[in-house]
Regions:
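Small/polar-residue-rich segments within soluble enzyme cores
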Residues: 1-98, 425
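Solvent-exposed, polar/charged alpha-helical surfaces in well-ordered, non-transmembrane soluble domains
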Residues: 5, 13, 17, 21, ...
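Beta-lactam-recognizing serine transpeptidase/beta-lactamase-like catalytic domain environment
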Residues: 80-92, 131-176, 181-427, 457, ...
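A short acidic/glycine-rich loop-to-helix N-cap element
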Residues: 428-439
Length: 476
């Protein structure tokens, strides 16, 4: 037999007050707590939400359910008379094993990121978009936003597609942003040099019966120009100088194929075909960012390697936990041998040598300067390093790449020589223009410029507009 049943939950307080005096004996009201999200849709996909019993259902609420909700607290009581129970004499009053989490998110940066990714998607007449802002040196995630979003307070009014934190759950083919990985791997292996020129085959190159094309036809390009002009043909030629297994090792070292371990819920590892299965077409395509699935956060972590002179910095979202006594904790070891929680920055890992990272960073700076594909990412008074990306979307129904759907992106960091923030902007299926330099770069510019002002990094006199030749000492 059940001694208790709910008749209705979360009723309006005014209605409860009106009914209170009219209810028969045995029927009453119970006050319940519920999670309220004062910023409404801001950070909705990241935070997630709780259900009617305060259980985490999505996002960080789900990821850290056991910490945020705590364990049920038991009380030792004795019965006094027929109904009343009181705690036993001397029963210790212990706080429940419940924690709060201090996130790395800066609410000011989150607000402007939400605003500009929404504007970018609307102006590009696109399906959706994602933007991530990360502290370059520590890996702290300062903002993560996807548009369209949803209000966690009213989650039942939205479809499940709105709940996805596409910064970590959605895979996409990165396109030309991936070329920085290809160039750095080939430079590290000594297979190319800064003073080389590459034959662009007048805009069309055939590999294994597959035609690779450049947007603009070129005869020859220097190594800097390969990235600045974003040549697919030259990137394919450079990538194919690497053996598949060596290339695959570099790709994995940059974090692709494994979860970023940021603390965000539902991280996807992406998808990389094993090197032993690569055809010549696979090898060439991966060299310019097609045929590999990555998450936006994975791509940002890889870009950030060049902001850190060759070191990979693990992203993180939780600065520390706070217990019921107000103590800050960087680690929690639950009893019973369950998985430990560790918060805050982690130790960085060297991926490539500083000389290689510095050289590729100079190439990335040229991308945002006069004649580069991301002139719209440049910010007056700040030097910007970055790379555009425009990739086709594979259509499983057709069994080939779509001719109408694209992903446009731009990822980079600023100030280029002393990076404070690394940012990636991704626009899915833009209809106004399909190029990352046109639709994603301006969103990056606005987010980066305003973030610099928030962080009190003020503009300096403008840098020279272009740099076609770079000399690098072997001893640097």
């Amino acid at each position: 037999k059940r001694s208790f049943v709910w008749l209705k939950r979360r009723i309006d307080p005014e209605l409860a007050k009106a009914l209170e005096k009219q209810l028969p004996k045995g029927i009453g009201f119970v006050d319940e707590f519920r999670r309220y999200y004062p910023q409404r849709s801001e950070g909705g996909q990241m935070l997630g939400f709780t259900g009617i019993d305060s259980q985490g259902l999505e996002g960080l609420e789900y990821q850290y359910e056991s910490l945020l909700k705590g364990k049920p607290q038991g009380y030792i009581v004795e019965k006094e008379g027929t109904y009343r129970t009181v705690p036993l004499k001397g029963y210790p009053e212990r706080p429940p094993e419940q924690f709060s989490l201090q996130l790395t998110i800066d609410s000011r940066i989150q607000h402007l990121t939400e605003k500009h990714i929404a504007q970018g998607v609307i102006e590009a007449q696109a399906d959706r978009g994602t933007a991530i802002v990360m502290d370059s040196s520590s890996g702290a995630i300062l903002a993560v936003a996807s548009y369209p979003g949803f209000d966690p307070n009213r989650y039942r009014q939205f479809s499940r597609a709105h709940f996805l934190n596409r910064a970590v759950t959605s895979g996409y083919e990165p396109g030309s942003t991936f070329k920085i990985i290809t160039l750095s791997a080939a430079l590290s292996e000594g297979l190319i040099s800064v003073d080389q020129n590459f034959d662009c085959e007048n805009g069309e190159y055939k590999v294994g019966g597959h035609r690779i094309r450049d947007v603009k036809k070129h005869q020859q390009l220097s190594l800097l120009q390969v990235l600045k002009k974003s040549s697919n043909i030259c990137a394919a030629k450079i990538g194919m100088r690497l053996s598949p297994h060596v290339f695959q090792d570099y790709i994995k070292n940059f974090g692709f194929g494994s979860r970023p371990d940021s603390g965000l819920a539902a991280e996807a590892p992406g998808k990389l075909l094993p090197a032993k299965k690569w055809t010549a077409v696979d090898h060439a395509s991966i060299s310019f960012g097609q045929g590999i699935l990555v998450s936006p956060l994975q791509m940002l972590v890889a870009i950030n390697v060049f902001a850190n002179r060759g070191k990979l910095v693990t992203p993180f979202t939780v600065q520390h936990a706070i217990d019921a006594s107000g103590n800050s904790l960087n680690q929690i070891d639950p009893p019973g041998g369950s998985e430990s929680y560790r918060f805050g920055p982690k130790e960085s890992k060297r991926i490539i040598e500083p000389q290689v990272a510095d050289l590729v960073r100079e190439f990335m700076i040229s991308v945002t300067q006069e004649g580069g594909t991301a002139r719209r990412a440049s910010i007056e008074g700040y030097q910007v390093a970055g790379k555009t990306g425009t990739s086709q979307v594979y259509d499983p129904k057709l069994g080939r790449y779509s001719k109408t759907q694209y992903v446009a992106s731009f990822g980079g960091f600023t100030p280029a020589k002393d990076p404070r923030v690394s940012i990636l902007v991704l626009i899915r299926n833009p209809r106004k223009s399909l190029y990352g330099g046109v639709v994603a770069a301006p969103v990056f510019r606005e987010i980066a410029r305003k973030t610099m002002l928030i962080q009190k990094v003020f503009p300096e006199p403008s840098q020279p507009n272009d740099q076609e030749s770079i000399r690098v000492s072997r001893n640097d």
